[in-house]
Amino acid sequence: MSKSIGILGAGIGGLHLALYLQKQGIAASVLTDRAPEQYAATRLMNTVAHHSVTIARENELGVNHWDDPQVVYHHHDHFFNFPDSGLLFRGAFQRPSRAVDYRIYLPALMKDFEDRGGLIEYASIQDDDIPALVSRFDLLVVSTGKGALGRMFAHRPELSPYTRPQRLLCVGLYDGVDHGSPDDDDPRGVTLSVSPGHGEMIVIPTLSFGGMKTALLMENIPGGDMADLVSLSYDANPAAFRQTLLDKLEKHHPHTYNRIDTHRFGLAQPLDLLQGAVVPTVRQSWVAFDGDKLAIALGDVHSVVDPLMGQGANMASYAAFELGKAITDAVAFDARFVEDVDRARENRVLAAARWTNMMLQPPSEAMGRLIFAMSQDRELCDEFTENFNYPERQWDRLASDKRIHAWIDRSGRIAA
């Protein structure tokens, strides 16, 4: 059968799908509004970590250009800023993860695709372009949610009930933060820091322009003491922004503050700051058009997760591969095709959404017990950490209080 695939959007989902189909000899065209050479001058897009399952897919596609022990990290440090005393413990990955600035990552993959003969069309897609695109391709994959593209796919509140952001984000790349080194006894790792009632911060060693930087991804609870960082202007007064941030880090995230060289601390460059919020959303996975044509959602168009658990990019890559396999095997692009795609990808994708949404809420008694148990049991914390690769396994353990207690008790583990 004819298989001409149109992919709207050049994020990780769209590019991993395009590169996968290219390997299978299937014609795929990527449509995007940003050329590779434009990325370097744009604002920070996100702070994304790729776990080992995603790096393995990059190896399969031949696009892992960052296979360097100087770039990867190996563990998560968990810090809870409790009033009486902080709680600090570590969980390790079986294989390392890494973070690369998407202003470097995405242009590199676009170049790979084009160098191998792939077609990328650079244009802004308007609402009235959609019917012609649907007619042009045998299957239209929508992996960008801009404008009418995202609105085509209805919200499924039974899978993600939120209608407003649960966190106010202040994300930046900084110099002057110690995140470990591959050359000493404290290898690079990510810190997951919690200030109860105020929010979380994820500290990520990240390869960016000029080498390794540190991403501070602040997930601030509306109404909390950190919340005003979402609107604090850096451009209006960089020194005031820096001092306000340092003061709040000292109060709410002291474990990270103590690793800051205050003489060197600051944004790596003015564009390395992103402020805003996202509404966690799961949408209908496809929409039908006249002429027996359909469009299928991929990545953030299908499921937008808060960045708290770092699942968005890893899920988009996973879903791209599952969709690519289904396209390769398809005999028709119809409702049955979509059922096959959804069956293949939804267990992991929906587990990531549900797990992340749960972690946005105050911890239950069972979750509090798990946190304490992980602080006492390195094997348990290692398992929790490795499951960042496999959110369906994590959700199997966290989906109810009964499951959490059973996980803790499984090997005779004892927790208060």
Residue ranges and their predicted role:
Residues 7, 275-355:
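Conserved mid-domain beta->alpha element of the FAD-binding
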Residues 8-10, 19-43:
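Glycine-rich FAD pyrophosphate-binding loop
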Residues 194-273:
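Conserved FAD/dinucleotide-binding core of flavoprotein oxidoreductases
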Residues 153-191:
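Central beta-strand plus flanking loop segment that forms part of the substrate or channel wall
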Residues 270, 309-310, 325-416:
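C-terminal helical "tail/cap" subdomain of flavin- and related membrane-associated enzymes
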Residues 34-80:
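N-terminal FAD cofactor-binding segment of flavoenzymes
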Residues 45-50, 92-108, 143, 149-150, ...:
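Short beta-strand to alpha-helix junction loop
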Residues 1-13:
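Beta1/beta-strand and adjacent pyrophosphate-binding region of the FAD-binding site
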